[in-house]
Amino acid sequence: MRAVHFGAGNIGRGFIGSLLAASGYDVVFVDVNEQIVRLLKERGEYRVIVAGEQREEQWVRGVSALNSQTEREKVIEVIADADLVTTAVGPPILPAIAPVVAAGLQRRFAIQQKPLHVIACENMIAGTEALKQHVLAHLSEAEQQLASEHVGFLNCAVDRIVPNQTNDDPLAVTVEPFFEWAIEARNVIGTVPPIQGAHFVADLGPYIERKLFTVNTGHALAAYLGYLRNYKTVQEAMNDEGIRLNVEQALSESGAVLVKKHGWSEKEHHAYIDTTIGRFMNPSLSDDILRVARSPIRKLGPNDRLVAPAVQYCALFGKVPHGLAKGIAALLRFDDSRDAEAAALQQTIAQHGIEGALRQYAGLESAHPLVAAVREEYDQMDENKRL
């Protein structure tokens, strides 16, 4: 079996590529980083360090690589013969790889019609569907019909902390022990592709929301509260009992929303929350607070990690979630001048107040009870950024 994976960065090597290799695929990485591509070609293997209570080294073998800029024809050839195509390139790059994926499908349709599955492993909702639309734009009507019959575009949700890192060996990558790869099965063509460690589900929606309202919510809260106390990493922030209790309160609130909406076991979801808290406190990882906190305007969105669970909590339970409100207030205090969104957010607050910022970016009218709660928490965080 052969898998073509776009993106030989830390997530590509440390998460997706390692699972595919363990599943028996010959993995061909496709990237533009000439050093990484060259080393993968020369060595055919790399090291993954799993940073748990005890560090474990895993060797990923039987891999190769191609440069998508200088070896485009070879990339087309391997797609034409592949069993699986995956990506971990970042959402903005999906349109850039679509032309070569489309060319690979065109070559494939000319020589064979065996099923191919495409899975975009990106930190976005419906990432594979987005890639599919970009690819279809480069195909004729007849080729689009062939794609609908022989290519399964499978949406997925991925979760593994792979922190920013610098290693002596450019191919080595450190990851946390926990991972989740949930793949929606509805568009499978023929048989489900064998992927060790992944699980196929009928409806991906609840899994995406569980991660967004737990992992992303908690991560953001720890970062914004940690920033106010001048911590450098999420791990440092989570060792502050006050911050940890704030995060636990917010995740209890977002968890109540999930349990109510999806009919889940409260006990099982609280175990998931406990696991998530443990991941944030992993002393073997160093998760930079400025990296986690960046792009606050996006994270203040009405469908994102803080406002969405808070608004739904208000609607479901008729009261304000004070833990989530404190997280939103801390986000509004994030003023790192190196972050363009943080600078724009602070300018909006200076001109229109936090009510104006919440209206513009979170879609919250001033009369919404959450706004008053956020204002109260915000005012308690003075200009010296004390909690």
Swiss-Prot record:
Which top EC class is given?
oxidoreductase
Q: Return the similarity comment.
A: Belongs to the mannitol dehydrogenase family.
Q: Which PROSITE patterns is this protein grouped with?
A: MANNITOL_DHGENASE
| Reaction(s) catalysed by this chain's protein | D-mannitol 1-phosphate + NAD(+) = beta-D-fructose 6-phosphate + NADH + H(+)
Disulfide bond annotation, renumbered to this chain: none
Looking up InterPro entries in the UniProt record yields: 6-PGluconate_DH-like_C_sf, 6PGD_dom2, Mannitol_1_phos_5_DH, Mannitol_DH, Mannitol_DH_C, Mannitol_DH_CS, Mannitol_DH_N, NAD(P)-bd_dom_sf
Binding site residues for NAD(+) = 3-14
Q: What is this protein called?
A: Mannitol-1-phosphate 5-dehydrogenase
What does the UniProt keyword field contain?
NAD, Oxidoreductase
Q: Biological process (GO) annotations? A: mannitol catabolic process
Q: Which GO terms describe its cellular component?
A: cytosol
What Enzyme Commission number(s) appear in the record? 1.1.1.17
Q: Name one GO molecular function term.
A: mannitol-1-phosphate 5-dehydrogenase activity
Q: Which Pfam families match?
A: Mannitol_dh, Mannitol_dh_C
